[in-house]
Amino acid sequence: MMLLASLFTVVALLSGCAGTAGTPGAAASSPARRTPVRIATLKGPTGVGMVHLMQAQDAGTTANDYAFAVTAAPEDVVAKVATGDVDIAAVPTNLAAVLNAKTSGAVQMLAVNTLGVMYIVTDGVPLAGMADLKGRTIHASGQGSNPEYVLRFLLERNGLDPDTDVHIVWKSEHDEVATLVAGGDAEVALLPEPFVTAVTVKNPELAVELDLTTEWTKAVTDGSQLMMGGVIARRDFVEQHPDAVAAFLTEYAASIEAAKTDAETTSALCEQYGIIPSAAVAKQALPRLNLTFLAGEDMLAGLQGYFRVLYDADPKAVGGSLPDAGFYYTTR
């Protein structure tokens, strides 16, 4: 139990998904005067793709002059964007939509950086797909938020009634669910990374049976994707500094690619910059973080369907209304 407690202490901060460490800075030539850009990022999967750019900034090789703020609280990022204290922020995509609504369109979605990070973990229950959950008890957290909306949507798309065909036991925190499944007190659990890594390290008998990102792709026909993390910018900053925004996107794409291809360096940088407190946990979690870089039409096609699912479940999940076309930054 001491090991389990220490693992969960590490990961509890995180939930709220080819190159080298120098790749982001090398991707663009430095202008005569580097534009100051203030960036806020959340700890956990949403911030992992930023770490190589942070290292390049420390080395002085970036096109822009970046100042980074790392926080565990989404509300802190929202406040900084709303007050103009940051120019660019890495946040959950639905939070971006909410912030867009609250600020009357004062932010734009630049790119998606993370697909889904939610998984079905089981203790001796093999699953070929969502339909195999019929008759099962699922332990989960996140009732009234994205985990519930996504789970119910996927169950329904696979012919199951979430209220009668399965029994969902809602817990208040991810670590409660993790403790149950790791201790053998839950056969089926819905968990995000890096909690998935924590429980499978504690109990090697557990199996990661379903990736909800994959299950989403199998369930939809509209081209949407489970897109859970992205980067936004203040609209006035985009309009005043288009070249700086374009340079950021180029360097950020390179940073994400480096994070996907160099696990050793990435995990060390995650610990160094406080994105994930343990390099060991980061390294094991990386393959399931579903890091990506999708911008322009690719971002638009994937996000609109995802937002529609959230809106149909609860309009407040995306700020009360679906974002209009102006929310999506589509010029690079």
Feature names for model-found ranges:
Residues 304-332:
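Conserved C-terminal helix/tail region of periplasmic/extracytoplasmic solute-binding proteins
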